[in-house]
Every structure is written in C-alpha cells, then in structure tokens.
Amino acid sequence: MAACTSSLVSLLLLLLLLLLLLVAGEATAEAALNFTRQDFPGGLRRRHICLPGFRDADSITFPRDIESLTCGTHMCLDPRGSHTSVTQCHGECHRRNVIESQSRFRRTYEGATGEDGRTPSIWDTFTHSGRMADNSTGDRAAAGYHKYKEDVKLMSDTGLEAYRFSISWSRLIPRGRGPINPKGLEYYNDLIDKLVKRGEICDCSMGIEIHVTLYHLDFPQALQDEYNGWLSPRIIEDFTAYADVCFREFGDLVRHWTTVGEPNVLSIAGYDSGVIPPCRCSPPFGTSCAAGDSTVEPYFAAHNSILAHASAVRLYWDKYQAKQKGVVGTNIYSFWPYPLSRSCADIDAVQRVLDFTIGWILDPLVYGDYPEIMKKQAGSRIPSFTKEQSELIRGSADFIGINHYKSLYVSDGSNREKAGLRDYNADMAAHFRGFGQFDKEDSLNDTERVEYLSSYMGGTLAALRNGANVKGYFVWSFLDVFELFAGYHSPFGLHHVDFEDPSLPRQPKLSAQWYSKFLRSEIGINIEKMVSPDEHEHAYYQ
C-alpha cells in the first residue's frame, strides 16, 4: 500500500507538470499572463530539452523522468556526456523562433509520384489499391515538387525561420540502393538552396533553418518486395547507405537530421493493426491484412529500425559530424496515458503503456536494451540485442524528438480475457485535441486553431516559468496536404490549399495571419485560464 501511495503522489506531480506544459487553459487562474515571442528564452523552436550526461544512465531516469516534461516536444540530448549548451548543440542559429512547415513525410506534400525517375513506395501501392477512405491516391498531393519555390517564398512572407521535411527515398535512390536519381538530387538540392537563401528574415547566415527526416513511413516498394522491408536485418545496411548519400550530398547546409520518424508507429500501425502499409497483421489485432503476425512482427520491425538508426548515427558521427557540425537523432510518436481511477492497478497500467509505446524505443537508446516488462511479457517473441548491438545503440542520439498527438485514459486489463489485448494488458480510451476544421469557410476563419495555438504556447510559457527546460516547438502544419487517413479532407494547415482547383492555390487562414503577427512581435498572447491541481485531479479521477 505504501508503494501504491508513493506511486500516486509521484503520478499527481507528473500530471500537474504535464498540465502546465500541454493544456494551459481549462480552469481558473489567479492572474492572466501576457507575453510575446520574446518571452521564450530559446525562441519558438519545437521544444528542445538539452540534458548533460545522456550516456550516464544512472544520472537520469530516462525516459520516465523526461516523459513527464516533454510530451509533444523535441529534446536535445548530448550522448557523449559533455555539458553541451543549447547553442553548442544546435549551432549559432538555435535561438530563433521556428514553426514546423511540412507534414510528416514528403509524399503528402510533393506529389509527382511517377515523375522524373521516382519509383513506387509502399504508400503508392497502398493508395492505388483503394485503401483510402476518399479513394484518393496522393499522386498530386499539394504539388510541392513543382510549387516548392512558391511555398518557400510563402514561408518567408509568413516569417518562418525553420522548415522540417523528409526525403523520399524512392525519389533519391529509385531502386532503394545503387544509383542516385539526378532529378531527385537536383530537386532536394534546389529546395535546400532556396531555403538557405531566405536569410533576410533571419538574424544569422543560415536563412530558413533546415530539419531533415531521412525516413518517415514511405519505404521503397522495390526493397519491400525483395526482403519484406523492416522485418529483415538487411534493411540496416541499405538504410545506412541511403543515409550516407543524404549526409554527403546535403550535409553542407543541413545541420539537423532525424533518422527514422516514429518507429513505434511504423511497427504498430504497419505490422500490428496493419492500418498503414505494408499492412501486415493477424486477428484479433488486425483483420484486413493478407499476411502477417501481429504477435511477433511489430517487435522485429522496431528492432531493425533501432539498429538501422544507430548504424546511421554512428556513420554520421564518425564520417561527417566533425566537418559538418550537425546533430542527428530520432523521433517517436507519443501520447500521455492517465489512469482511469486511483487504483494501483490502473496506475501500474499507465507505466506498462509507457514502457510498451515510448520506452520500447527510448530505453534501448539510453540503456541498450528493452524495458524489463516488455521482455517479460513478450518473452521469446521480442528479439534480443547482442552485446555488440547494445553498445551500438546505447547513447546513439544527439536528440530525441517526441511528437505528441493525444492523451488517453488507461485502465488495467490484466485480469480480463486475453483475446484482443496487447502484451501490456491495458484498456485505453482516446481523448483527441486536434485542430482540423473541415468546412472551407470555417477552415479559413479558423478561430479554434488560433485558440489552440495560443493555449499551447501559454502552457509552454507556464512550464518555462515553473522550471521546465523548454526551448520551443514546431506548429503542425504549414499547408493543407494529403493526410494519411483522410486524404484531401483534413485541412490541418495554416494555409488553405484548394484541392478542387487544378492550380492548387494557397491562401492564408486566420491562424497563419495570427501566427505571422506573433512571430513578428506584433501581437501577444493572453492566458486567462490555468488548471489548478485540485481541479485537474478531479477531472481525471471523478
């Protein structure tokens, strides 16, 4: 009982801290907070938290201590144990305001899927098989392949100082390995050059700062056909060779690299539920797949993605970092689970969910191995790291990026029927806080999105004033794009794209105008409501 009480006290402290960071605005406050971008000491970069001594696993309880601070953030972690400052970690241009100006991976923006030597990816196969709800394919998307010059100017006009995008492996290296596609190389080089030349909006020489993700769910179909993609250890060599090309060709101007975007989504959605390509699953976890084993394959896909990440990181450190002065890390999907009740069982279920979703990827990068509960529950179904592999992956990141999308209520499921339950034995109910508005008129006059951004920034400032080492964040997203599950019917961008018009014109929404004024310090933010600890506890334990 004492252990349960201690856990409950710790959890309540975590919930309070998360509250300050994430929701900022659902109850009452003693005084309103007014601030502008100058109140953010590191600017509005997508929140980077720098901690010394990443390799000294005994000095920090990671990811557990950090999870309470950083849902929805990027963290900068120094893997070599030195007391690296924020500026050292990210270069002289770090202290600037930043917005994420692109969707999660290039296919949703670029389009031109069959042009200039690009070969199919697994997402092309998926959409062309009629799997999208609106029967769209994304072949055109937001036409970024042809309209990127216009979009870079729009970024500059808006006041953006950083741009985050991923590279299409199938466009750069059409067969997945071997010869580079000259047209693909030309496209990415010109995009990067155009971003860098927009230096007049920045107080340093780097123009619009570039953050590149090497891989985000868009695997070359050629390699998928050859050896089942992430299920095979052969991916490690091919991914490292692909990363080598990117570091060599673009590293003179790119200082921030993410290896694999959301490897836990890759594993769960691609190989457990099978709702995204390569659509592998088995009942009862997924029922619409032609092949797969949901009890084994997600673990192997994640395992190989961790090893591929570490291999690429070590390559960058050994071959490029000294000259290029960049940083490299990974990025994971994150939601925050709340216990449905005060019971010890539900509180323990929260930790299991964290271990099986976040710790699954982060524990190997810190400790060199999976969480103990995962190894116990999954047994022989989860691969083991050799001693050499453990040394390779431990500390293999300059930063860890965390994408936060939603929060969940969690209850214990360990005493219920096992059919249909995951290894962590917890039932979850999702509580979304998105800001997509689907009617065109409402989308353009998106007051709810403005309120959301204002509240989120207010929560960030509150966390800063309460001691959290928060440095900024990217806003999602710059343009309406082809979305993973909703196709062209989920306008989450700050700028509207008219997908009914063949020319795909862009039009700033109210949120784009508001954010641009905020970036230029023409307006501030007034936070009139904060959630008190008592009200927060009542909200989640009523």
Curated annotation (Swiss-Prot):
Residues 1-29 form the signal peptide. A beta-D-glucoside binds at residues 88, 216, 405, 476, 492. Pfam families: Glyco_hydro_1 (PF00232). Disulfide bonds join 281-289. GO terms for biological process: carbohydrate metabolic process. Keywords: Disulfide bond, Glycoprotein, Glycosidase, Hydrolase, Signal. Gene3D superfamilies: Glycosidases (3.20.20.80). The active site is at 262 (proton donor). It catalyses: Hydrolysis of terminal, non-reducing beta-D-glucosyl residues with release of beta-D-glucose. It is an enzyme of class 3 (hydrolase). This is Putative beta-glucosidase 23. The gene is BGLU23.
